[in-house]
Amino acid sequence: LRDYANRVINGGPVEAAGPPA
């Protein structure tokens, strides 16, 4: 969940976020 959480926290779109590994 590191990449997913980081991108969501950074304000990036969830669609562009990596897979919730």
Swiss-Prot record:
Subcellular location field: Secreted
Keywords on record: Hypotensive agent, Metalloenzyme inhibitor, Metalloprotease inhibitor, Protease inhibitor, Secreted
Purpose: Inhibits angiotensin-converting enzyme (ACE), but does not serve as substrate for the enzyme. Potentiate bradykinin (BK) on the isolated guinea pig ileum as well as the isolated rat uterus for contraction. Also potentiates in vivo the depressor effect of BK on arterial blood pressure in the normotensive anesthetized rat. Intracerebroventricular injection into mice does not show toxic activity.
Domain of life: Eukaryota
Tissue specificity field: Expressed by the venom gland.
Cellular component GO terms, alphabetical: extracellular region
GO terms of molecular function: peptidase inhibitor activity
UniProt similarity note: Belongs to the non-disulfide-bridged peptide (NDBP) superfamily. Scorpion BPP (group 1) family.
Name of the protein this chain belongs to: Bradykinin-potentiating peptide K12
Signal peptide location: none
Entry's Gene Ontology BP terms: regulation of blood pressure
